[in-house]
From Swiss-Prot:
Annotated source species: Lysinibacillus sphaericus (strain C3-41)
Protein name: Putative cysteine ligase BshC
InterPro entries on file: Bacillithiol_biosynth_BshC (IPR011199), CC_BshC (IPR055399), Rossmann-like_BshC (IPR055398)
Coiled coil: 419-445
Top EC group: ligase
Gene encoding the protein: bshC
MF GO annotations: ligase activity
Entry's family note: Belongs to the BshC family.
EC number assigned by the record: 6.-.-.-
Keywords recorded for this protein, A-Z: Coiled coil, Ligase
Lineage: Bacteria, Bacillati, Bacillota, Bacilli, Bacillales
Length: 538
């Protein structure tokens, strides 16, 4: 494996400015991303140390059924003894979800190792699974390349209810069929049989979307000791009881400062990423595994569609006695994370960076300090076949991103078309049109009214000429299919859906090609968090 670092123009203006000094975005964050910030944040955490024994026990209890590695055990011991964490999270996507879920986990691990060395203190990697999320349409599918076409492959079982990923049971038969469909699209290699067995074995041990995701992630990163926790885990929810109480007690103020901060963010030119409102309670109520977003109205916490209505006292009692009935939203999740973990830095993507920019004052409302925001690593995997095609056509990866492969494909298709055949068909059409015109004139002289039939007949001939032209063009394309397919492959592999590969494909198509050691090889590379984009040549 070879690693190449390249500079790519950052289209997201929040992220672009975050990596630039002296830009307006930095006023929305407690820290910039530099060594001094990590030293300062570590000092702050040391001054606000807390007992982490109960938290450690909850993570251990969650992870034991997944299989605790020696390294994970070491990290749990360090956490119990007061270690700081680098934390990132993601929804419980099918087959781990898009590649950026894996890239985020790698970012967490890399940064934890780096800061452990720099600070000479224990820093452990933690992955927060957003099992409380209920938008299953976002996590129930993946993409593959089938022939030349990009195919969306979805798990067929649908739920009419907005149940959380952690409460949605998997249909093993449907999921097994989904796995076989995805792997069949990817194609047969020496690793395929073992890959299918591995996925089906993990599936058979899993009950829910979150369970399946957690087991796969643990399998991929157990040697690195990545600690996992499900946001919807029952024991974790009990641990968060007091924190929910704080959020409820300060609900109005949190909503107000987030709304004001987002308005300021918009005035500064960064838009409104979360569309905050002053009525937002920033909590969901969970009923039979289904989440209902609450808002405040006349001193009540309500969801009219679900016929829910609570007084502040009633909601505080729920937080105290039944915290599993509460769930965080985009605003309260980072606050809950800060109240729960000793967060040195949070690893997130461009979207998360934008909404975190609205939260600085919300942290202050709860007497918290916003941690360092670490943008995740961005990577593109270049297979041997793709690298060969790039060399053959003298293209770079950035050329493909900029549309050059598509331009070359269109130019090639234009150049190979049979111009003479097209000219002859046009001549035949012109000759026939002249003959129809002569016939129409003659019939008019004979007072034979057949205009409609003539027009219809001429239209039928025109359709036949079009059909003939299309068939000739398709035959020419078929003749040059091998060359055309090469350009299509470059586009599908490196810029699918007109976006980065990491947003479309899951990692298993690359495990199928490279083998089960891919993650270990990726983690051997020398990364640093920054504004570069990494190319990984397999």
């Amino acid at each position: 494996m070879k690693l190449e670092s390249i500079q790519v123009p950052i289209k997201n203006n929040v992220l672009a400015d975050y990596w630039s000094p002296n830009t307006a975005i930095h006023q929305f964050f407690e820290y910039e991303f530099n060594d001094q910030a990590f030293e300062k944040r570590a000092k702050h955490l040391a001054q606000h140390a807390r007992d982490q024994k109960e938290l450690t026990a909850i993570i251990r209890q969650f992870m034991e059924p997944l299989g605790l590695s020696q390294k994970a055990n070491e990290h749990l011991q360090q956490l119990e003894q007061g270690a700081m964490v680098i934390i990132g999270g993601q929804q419980a996507g099918i087959l781990t979800g898009p590649l950026y879920s894996v890239h985020k986990a790698i970012s967490v691990i890399v940064l934890a190792k780096e800061q452990s060395v720099k600070l000479q203190r224990s820093v452990v990697p933690v992955f927060w699974i957003a099992g409380e999320d209920h938008d299953l349409e976002e996590i129930n599918h993946t993409y593959t390349v089938h022939g030349e076409l990009l195919k969306k492959r979805a798990y067929s079982e649908r739920s009419r209810r907005k149940t959380m990923a952690s409460a949605t049971m998997l249909n093993k038969e449907s999921m097994t069929q989904f796995i076989h469909t995805v792997v069949r699209d990817i194609g047969e290699t020496e690793y395929t049989e073992a890959l299918i067995k591995q996925l089906v074995d993990v599936l058979n041990e899993s009950e829910t979307f979150t369970d399946f995701f957690a087991r796969l992630m643990n399998q991929l990163f157990k040697d690195e000791g990545l600690l996992l926790i499900d946001a919807a885990d029952y024991n974790f929810r009990q641990y968060e009881s007091t924190n929910f109480t704080h959020i409820i007690q300060h609900s109005e103020e949190i909503a107000r400062v987030v709304t004001e901060k987002e308005e300021q963010l918009e005035r500064t030119g960064y838009g409104k990423p979360i569309l905050a409102t002053r009525e937002a309670a920033n909590l969901f109520y969970v009923e039979d595994g289904e989440r209902h977003l609450l808002e405040r109205k006349n001193d009540l916490f309500i969801n009219l569609a679900a016929n829910l209505k609570f007084t502040r006292e009633e909601l505080l009692e729920i937080a105290e006695k039944y915290p599993e009935r509460l769930s965080n939203n985009v605003v309260s999740r980072p606050l809950m994370q800060e109240m729960t973990f000793p967060v040195l830095a949070f690893v997130g993507g461009p979207g998360e960076l934008a909404y975190w920019a609205t939260l600085k004052s919300a942290f202050s409302v709860l007497d918290l300090q916003m941690p360092i925001f670490a943008p995740r690593l961005h990577m593109t995997i270049v297979t041997r076949h793709v690298e060969q095609l790039l060399r053959e056509h003298q293209l770079s990866v950035t050329d493909v991103w900029n549309g050059k492969a598509l331009e070359m494909k269109e130019r090639f298709i234009h150049d190979v078309q049979d111009i003479e055949a097209k000219r002859q068909i046009q001549a035949m059409e012109q000759l026939l049109a002249e003959k129809y015109s002569e016939l129409a004139s003659y019939l008019e002289e004979q007072h034979l009214t057949l205009d409609k039939i003539l027009v219809k007949n001429q239209e039928n001939h025109a359709k036949q000429f079009d059909y003939l032209q299309q068939k000739i063009e398709q035959t020419v394309l078929d003749k040059h299919e091998t060359t055309i397919r090469k350009f299509t492959t470059l586009q599908n592999e490196l810029y699918p859906n007109e976006g980065f590969q990491e947003r479309t494909y899951n990692p298993y198509q690359y495990f199928n090609e490279f083998g089960p050691m891919l993650i270990a090889e990726m983690l051997k590379q020398n990364y640093s968090i920054g504004k570069h984009h990494y190319l990984l040549y397999l």
